[in-house]
């Protein structure tokens, strides 16, 4: 029986989010609003009413696309907080709108799109000028995105 089990594939099983009580959330922290990982930019609490709990009004900006989301929830309720990882990779190429990135272990990743807008133009410009740069990649809830560029150390 044990010979048939294969544990070589898959991740560690870590959840992409964890619960946190609404009243424990803080500005500049992270929360899942409308199913999207967001950075909290505004937060206000209303007093308890005649019936019910204090309410927390949250305003967040999606960390991947910059859209604004709002939600109101009782302060005693739990909200999902995304597990966010940030990694730096060395840029070694750009091909067909995708970045070629070198990981710390020496492997090459070619599955990340060149970001649109100013950041994408800056990455292309520095690469074309043969500058050694690192790309900061943020990942949360099975999504990844290049968010910053910095010179190699």
From Swiss-Prot:
Give residues where N-acetylalanine occurs: 2
Q: List the subcellular locations.
A: Cytoplasm; Nucleus; Endoplasmic reticulum membrane
Keywords (A to Z) from UniProt: Acetylation, Cytoplasm, Elongation factor, Endoplasmic reticulum, Hypusine, Membrane, Nucleus, Protein biosynthesis, RNA-binding
- Output the PTM entry: Lys-50 undergoes hypusination, a unique post-translational modification that consists in the addition of a butylamino group from spermidine to lysine side chain and leads to the formation of a hypusine residue. eIF-5As are the only known proteins to undergo this modification, which is essential for their function.
Query: For this UniProt entry, which segments traverse the membrane?
Result: none
Residues annotated with Hypusine modification: 50
Return the SUPFAM superfamilies for the record: Nucleic acid-binding proteins, Translation proteins SH3-like domain
**Gene3D superfamilies reported in the protein's UniProt record:** 2.30.30.30, Nucleic acid-binding proteins
User: Is Protein biosynthesis one of the keywords?
Assistant: yes
Q: Tell me the GO molecular function terms.
A: ribosome binding; RNA binding; translation elongation factor activity
Q: How does it sit in the membrane?
A: Peripheral membrane protein
A GO biological-process term? positive regulation of translational elongation
Q: Which GO terms describe its cellular component?
A: endoplasmic reticulum membrane; nucleus
Q: Which domain of life does this protein belong to?
A: Eukaryota
InterPro entries to which the protein is assigned, alphabetical: IF5A-like (IPR001884), IF5A-like_N (IPR048670), NA-bd_OB-fold (IPR012340), Rib_uL2_dom2 (IPR014722), Trans_elong_IF5A_hypusine_site (IPR019769), Transl_elong_IF5A_C (IPR020189), Translation_prot_SH3-like_sf (IPR008991)
Summarize the subunit comment. Binds to 80S ribosomes. Actively translating ribosomes show mutually exclusive binding of eIF5a (EIF5A or EIF5A2) and EEF2/eEF2. Interacts with DAPL1; interaction takes place at the polypeptide exit tunnel of hibernating ribosomes and prevents translation.
What family does this belong to? Belongs to the eIF-5A family.
The function of this protein is: Translation factor that promotes translation elongation and termination, particularly upon ribosome stalling at specific amino acid sequence contexts. Binds between the exit (E) and peptidyl (P) site of the ribosome and promotes rescue of stalled ribosome: specifically required for efficient translation of polyproline-containing peptides as well as other motifs that stall the ribosome. Acts as a ribosome quality control (RQC) cofactor by joining the RQC complex to facilitate peptidyl transfer during CAT tailing step.
Name of protein? Eukaryotic translation initiation factor 5A-2
- Protein species of origin: Gallus gallus (Chicken)
């Amino acid at each position: 029986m044990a010979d048939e089990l294969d544990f070589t594939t898959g991740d560690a099983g870590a959840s992409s989010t964890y619960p946190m009580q609404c009243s424990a959330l803080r500005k500049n922290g992270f929360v899942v609003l409308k199913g999207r990982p967001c950075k909290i930019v505004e937060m206000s609490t209303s007093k308890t009413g005649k019936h019910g709990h204090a309410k927390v009004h949250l305003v967040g900006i999606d960390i991947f696309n910059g859209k604004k989301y709002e939600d109101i929830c009782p302060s005693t309720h739990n909200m999902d907080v995304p597990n966010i990882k940030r990694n730096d990779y060395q840029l070694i190429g750009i091909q067909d709108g995708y970045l070629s990135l070198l990981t710390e272990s020496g492997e090459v990743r070619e599955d990340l799109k060149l970001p649109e807008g100013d950041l994408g133009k800056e990455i292309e410009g520095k690469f074309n000028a043969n500058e050694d740069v690192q790309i900061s990649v943020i990942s949360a809830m099975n999504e990844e995105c290049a968010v910053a560029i910095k010179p190699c150390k």
